[in-house]
A protein has these predicted regions:
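Short, conserved structural patches
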Residues: 2, 55, 59-135
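Alpha-helical assembly-interface signal, strongest on the long, hydrophobic N-terminal helix that forms
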Residues: 2-75
């Protein structure tokens, strides 16, 4: 009986395997942080890309090098990520003498992991307005 108590006390006081258990408990948290940072990086990258595409498209239209319909196709093709194409609108306001390019994307389509589920039903929109140059 004393020998059994001694073995039980040694087992309970021993630290063997404790690191493995702690690691197993922390793995989901570490993976969630990794996936969350990857999702945020993808969103920031897409937003930066959409700003550049909108600015470039507005500049081309403001110089009268494209019509609004041509500019929408141009921007949509450049904004495509894999198989996903965001919504692109080009509006020329003759009275205000401006062109506005708007790119709207579903954030869930841009985030590869969406660990938190926050991207469902949310959109990211980028809008650039530029003055039309005189003809």
């Amino acid at each position: 009986m004393a020998q059994l108590k001694h073995r039980l006390r040694n087992f309970l006081n021993g630290a063997e395997g404790g690191v493995t258990v702690e690691f197993a408990l922390w793995v989901p948290v570490l993976l969630a942080m990794l996936f969350l940072s990857a999702d945020a990086s993808m969103l920031f990258s897409a937003q930066s890309n959409y700003w550049n595409i909108s600015r470039d498209t507005a500049r081309v239209v403001s110089r009268h090098a494209m019509t609004a319909a041509e500019a929408e196709v141009y921007a949509r093709e450049r904004a495509q990520i894999s198989t996903y194409q965001p919504d692109v609108r080009v509006l020329i306001d003759e009275r205000a003498n401006t062109v506005t390019v708007t790119i709207t994307a579903d954030t869930h389509a841009l985030m590869p992991f969406d660990v938190t589920g926050l991207a469902l039903g949310r959109t990211m929109s980028v809008q650039v307005t530029q003055s039309l140059e005189p003809i």
